[in-house]
Structure formats: structure tokens, C-alpha cells
Amino acid sequence: MIQSQHSQTARHALAETVVLAKARKNLSFAQLTDGTGLSEAFVTAALLGQHALPADAARIVADKLGLDDDAVLLLQTIPLRGSIDDRVPTDPTIYRFYEMLQVYGTTLKALVHEKFGDGIISAINFRLDVKKVDDPEGGSRAVITLDGKYLPTKPF
């Protein structure tokens, strides 16, 4: 039976356990994802408490991390989503995304509406990908793809 959570406490605690086990076993999120049939971004989000994993994927990941049956069950529950408090993020990486939306949020909104009309980009029917590429000027660049289904507003 599908279960859902009413608070973030249990999944936050499990996320801490996952991160510690991942570090102890020196595993990457890509290694944890192997064999699940899911994307690295989705599995990572699930392990950090933002998605439910299918039963087989939950078992595969839990076995790699040495987690118990309760953790397997918890990984399958629908979480209470949202990991950022109602304040400006202080983590530098998360803050940069916040800053990007502060600077480009209205631009993204204007361009999406101009190209698609009134509506939203789904975060449910959604794909996320992060790639590291060489910068021709030296160093590396992060290429982040946000791929969401467009959902038009329907008058009623």
C-alpha cells in the first residue's frame, strides 16, 4: 500500500544516515543509482528526502548502503517535499541558484509565457541533469538541464 509522510523529520534523519553511509563506503550518487533504472538526479533527490523510490530501487540502494528494512520502507514513502526553510539559503551552492532566480526569474517567466502562453513548467513531470564540461577559457563549466512538461492554465 502506498504510504505518505506528514512531516519531514523521518526523511531528514534518513537522509543524514544515507550521507554518512555513503561517505563510510566511499560511494558516489552515480554508483548508488547503478542498477535502479532511474536517473542519478532522481535517486539523489530521493535519498535526500524529496522523492519516493520504487520498491526494487529502494532495496538496491539500501543494500549498497547497508540500510535496514525500515529504511527501505521509508525510502518508498511519499515525502513531505521542500528542503529549504522559509529564509534565504546560506549554503553557497544553493544560494547561487537562489541568486540565479532572483536575477533571471522574471526573464524565465517572460520567455516561457511568450513561447508557451499562460501556464507553468511541471516539477512533477520533470527531468534534471547535471554535467561537467571543459571551459574553453580554462577550468570547468556546469551544464544544468531543467526539462519540465509545460502545463497551460485552463480557464474554468
Curated annotation (Swiss-Prot):
Keyword Lyase: yes
SUPFAM superfamilies referenced in this protein's UniProt entry, alphabetically: Cyanase C-terminal domain (SSF55234), lambda repressor-like DNA-binding domains (SSF47413)
Catalysed reactions, as listed in the record: cyanate + hydrogencarbonate + 3 H(+) = NH4(+) + 2 CO2
Enzyme nomenclature, EC number: 4.2.1.104
Record-linked InterPro entries: Cyanase, Cyanate_lyase_C, Cyanate_lyase_C_sf, CYNS_N, Lambda_DNA-bd_dom_sf
Keywords annotated in UniProt: Lyase
Protein family (similarity comment): Belongs to the cyanase family.
Protein name in UniProt: Cyanate hydratase
Organism: Burkholderia cenocepacia (strain ATCC BAA-245 / DSM 16553 / LMG 16656 / NCTC 13227 / J2315 / CF5610) (Burkholderia cepacia (strain J2315))
Gene: cynS
